[in-house]
C-alpha cells in the first residue's frame, strides 16, 4: 500500500464527518409563490438535504430542502422530473406501488403529499414486489429508438465514465484494489459501454426508499432520477449492493435478479450490461468508502476490510465473465 494513499485514508477515518442533525429548523419557509410553509417536524437530515413534515393550506405535506453548498437546483430538478414521470407511470400502468404527488417546487424547495407510513425492510417486503416493480419499470420506460446512456458518452468535462472512475479510485482508493484488477475493470467498461441502452430510471429503487402505510407501498426520493441511466442499473444497484453489504441475503438477491431477467428476456448484450453496472457499483463502493460524503455522493459509511475484500472478490469474478446470479 502506498504511504500517501494510506495516510489519506487514515486521515478520513479519523475525521469522519458528523451528519447535520439540527435540533430545530426554521419554523416558517416563504415560498416564491408568497405562501408560507410551517415546518412542524424534521423527519431526517444529512449533509445533502433536510426533509420535514410541514403544514400548508391546512393539510400535512412533505417538504425537502437542500443543504447550502451541497445540493442545489439540479438535484431538485431531477426529483421533480422523477416525480412527474413516475406519477404518469402509476396512472398508465397497474404497478405494485404508489408515488407521492408533487404539489410545489422551486430551486430551493420541494413539496409533495405526505406519506404516513414507515420505511420498509428487505426482510419484510416479499421478493415478488421487487421483481414486479423492476419488470414493470423496464417495460414502461423502454424507448422506441435505442439510445446510449450517459455512461457511454463524454461528460461535460469531456471525460468518459471509465476515466472518471480511474481518477476517483487513484485519488483515494488506489490502495484498496490490485493495479491489474483495476486495469481489467476499466478495460471492461471501455469495451462494453456501447452495449448499454438508456432508460429513464429512479436509480435508487431500494427498501430504504420504499415506505408502507399498512395498505400500500410508496416509492420516494427521486433525486437520482435521470432519463438516461443504463438499463438494468436499478435492479443491479439493489441486488449487488446487498450482496456486498448483507451477504446473508445473497440467495434472495440472486433470485430477484434472475427472475427479473427471466421475465424480461435476455438479449445478446444482457450479461455485459448487468456486469457493467455491477463493476461500476463495485468501484463506486471503493471510492465512496474512502471519501467523506458531499457533492459527489451521499454515503457516510467508511469501508471495512471485510467489505473491501468482498468488493475486490466480486470484481475479480465479474471481469472474468462471472454471472452475478451465481456469484
Per-segment meaning from a language model:
Residues 17-36, 145-202, 321-326:
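An alpha-helical support segment within catalytic cores of ATP-dependent transferases
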Residues 107-119:
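Conserved short submotifs of the Hanks-type protein kinase catalytic core
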Residues 89, 118-155, 179, 183-184, ...:
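Conserved kinase catalytic-core helix
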Residues 96-109:
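Short beta-strand micro-motifs within the conserved protein kinase catalytic domain, predominantly
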Residues 208-236:
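Catalytic activation segment of kinase domains across protein kinase-like and atypical kinase folds
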Residues 30-58:
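ATP-binding glycine-rich phosphate-binding loop
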Residues 233-266, 279-301, 306-309:
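Active-site activation/catalytic loop segments of kinase-like enzymes and analogous catalytic loops
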Residues 47-78:
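ATP-binding glycine-rich loop module of kinase domains
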Amino acid at each position: 500500500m502506498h504511504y500517501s494513499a494510506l495516510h489519506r485514508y487514515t486521515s478520513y477515518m479519523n475525521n469522519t464527518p458528523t451528519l447535520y442533525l439540527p435540533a430545530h429548523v426554521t419554523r416558517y419557509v416563504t415560498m416564491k409563490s408568497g405562501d408560507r410553509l410551517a415546518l412542524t417536524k424534521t423527519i431526517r437530515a444529512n449533509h445533502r438535504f433536510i426533509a420535514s413534515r410541514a403544514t400548508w393550506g391546512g393539510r400535512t405535506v412533505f417538504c425537502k430542502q437542500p443543504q447550502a453548498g451541497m445540493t442545489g437546483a439540479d438535484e431538485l430538478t431531477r426529483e421533480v422530473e422523477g416525480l412527474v414521470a413516475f406519477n404518469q407511470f402509476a396512472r398508465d400502468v397497474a404497478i405494485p406501488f404508489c408515488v407521492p404527488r408533487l404539489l410545489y417546487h422551486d430551486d430551493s424547495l420541494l413539496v409533495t403529499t405526505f406519506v404516513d407510513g414507515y420505511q420498509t425492510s428487505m426482510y419484510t417486503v416479499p421478493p415478488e414486489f421487487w421483481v414486479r416493480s423492476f419488470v414493470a419499470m423496464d417495460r414502461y420506460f423502454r424507448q422506441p429508438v435505442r439510445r446510449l446512456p450517459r455512461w457511454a458518452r463524454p461528460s461535460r468535462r469531456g471525460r468518459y465514465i471509465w476515466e472518471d472512475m480511474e481518477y476517483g479510485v487513484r485519488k483515494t482508493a488506489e490502495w484498496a484494489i490490485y493495479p491489474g484488477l483495476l486495469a481489467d475493470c476499466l478495460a471492461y467498461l471501455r469495451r462494453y459501454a456501447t452495449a448499454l441502452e438508456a432508460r429513464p430510471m429512479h436509480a435508487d429503487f431500494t427498501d430504504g426508499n420504499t415506505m408502507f402505510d399498512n395498505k400500500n407501498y410508496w416509492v420516494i426520493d427521486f433525486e437520482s432520477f435521470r432519463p438516461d441511466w443504463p438499463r438494468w442499473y436499478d435492479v443491479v444497484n439493489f441486488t449487488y449492493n446487498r450482496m456486498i453489504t448483507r451477504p446473508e441475503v445473497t440467495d434472495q438477491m440472486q433470485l430477484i435478479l434472475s427472475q427479473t431477467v427471466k421475465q424480461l428476456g435476455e438479449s445478446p448484450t444482457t450479461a455485459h450490461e448487468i456486469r457493467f453496472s455491477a463493476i461500476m457499483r463495485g468501484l463506486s463502493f471503493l471510492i465512496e468508502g474512502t471519501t467523506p460524503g458531499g457533492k459527489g455522493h451521499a454515503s457516510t459509511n467508511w469501508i471495512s476490510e471485510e467489505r473491501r475484500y468482498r468488493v475486490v472478490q466480486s470484481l475479480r469474478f465479474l471481469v472474468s465473465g462471472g454471472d452475478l446470479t451465481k456469484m
